[in-house]
Amino acid sequence: MNTKHDTAAEHHAAKRHWLNSHEAGYHKAMGNRQVQMIAIGGAIGTGLFLGAGARLQMAGPALALVYLVCGIFSFFILRALGELVLHRPSSGSFVSYAREFLGEKAAYVAGWMYFVNWAMTGIVDITAVALYMHYWGAFGDVPQWVFALGALAIVGTMNMIGVKWFAEMEFWFALVKVLAIIAFLVVGTIFLGSGKPLDGNATGFHLITDNGGFFPHGLLPALVLVQGVVFAFASIELVGTAAGECKDPESMVPKAINSVIWRIGLFYVGSVVLLVLLLPWTAYQAGQSPFVTFFSKLGVPYIGSVMNIVVLTAALSSLNSGLYSTGRILRSMSMGGSAPKFMSKMSRHHVPYAGILATLAVYVVGVFLNYLVPSQVFEIVLNVASLGIIASWGFIVVCQMRLRKAIKEGKAAKVSFRMPGAPFTSWLTLLFLFSVLVLMAFDYPNGTYTIGSIPLLAVLLVAGWFGVRKRVHAIHSTAPTLRK
């Protein structure tokens, strides 16, 4: 019995050794401040700056509770990822962990679903950059494609010349977003404490009770909003990919992850609570940033331009992150056979340039298609991409559960950074992700069509697997550390 147990442990150790060999070539150049900002930057997107106005209209003050619930489960997902990172840091992130604990088929599904997500998100980000630039009249005559290609050229170049440049750019992008929220929190808190009226209304908690209470439209609209709000945290998993190029992931990653939960609480929940204490929630409108609404009431000049800079930065940050992560994920998939062989190539700057160039090519094609296809079709495709995020988060949690099983069986060493409350919180998080899919199905028409597309996605993935399985089997049969 012991011999069989020892053989299983040795085989798993050999598999980890083979997976670690996939990390060869990367330059571990990221410092603590960069990893910290990548973690929080991934949790703050344009959803807070632009989308909060429409969501306040839909749910009122209850939006704060929705952000809190989604933030808690985002934290659980990050802690699950952190446990995996401490087990084995990898630039392949959850794709590499899926390969280790679930097999190559799971790595194939996880990787391509994640790529589809970033491909669609990136196209939207590039288009958004062009639209944000047109906000300023001076650029009104410049064609949108010029700004789109310009943004691609800048972000693509930074990603190609080295991880240090990506990390530095992402640090400053994230810092702009953080400083914008801090500025609102400081000014808003001071104004609230002064007791002065704003736009003819006294500030304070009575603005909630006098306008329908905490759930002005009832519980159901707030519940349905969960399926939209959860995607505001759609880049949190980036810290797992970055861990493979950190100077000291064992100390940096836990610090970065643990800081996310209180920052989500402060930035998301704190901002919404402050917004509804300063003005009636009915004062915020869809299509306008609630922060612009507040500062406009104060008479602050050029606030529209300032906020446009912030959302422009957020779009560039997302584009930057997408290129970085897809380059690493595609290389990890290629090493296992789930992606074309050329995508495993590295440059002399320690960058997986082939995967990045492939993503850039998709972005360029997508930008031009965006101007040709109907907007509703494009919106549905983007919603389908959201399934990639749910799938990625699901794989992270399942891999964490399999890691615990491997530790229990003596196949893997214990890690110091463990997901709190597991396995209960692991199952609860999976249930939450499933509930998001159910809520999406009730969001007619786009959400319903998105869930309805799952069988089609499954057929495409199965067809793709038949296209790569010969190479997958060849790689796995010849890897010396995997032969029993």
Regions found by a protein language model. Give the residues of each.
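Membrane-interface loop-to-helix entry segments
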Residues: Q144-A202, A234, I257-I261, L382-F395, ...
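C-terminal membrane-solvent junction of multi-pass transporters and transport-like membrane proteins
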Residues: M343-Y353, W393-Y444, P480-R483
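Extracellular loop-to-transmembrane helix junctions
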Residues: Y26-M30, L50-F147, V260-R263, V269, ...
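Hydrophobic alpha-helical segments of multi-pass membrane transport proteins
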Residues: A180-F184, L330, N383-A413, L428-V436, ...
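Membrane-interface "cap" regions at the ends of multi-pass membrane proteins
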Residues: M1-G53, Q57-A62, S74-R79, S91, ...
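TM-loop-TM module centered on a large, flexible mid-protein loop between adjacent transmembrane helices
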Residues: S96-A98, G103, Y135-F139, I208-G212, ...
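Hydrophobic, membrane-embedded alpha-helices of multi-pass small-molecule transporters
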Residues: M30-F49, A151-I154, I208-V269, L274-L275, ...
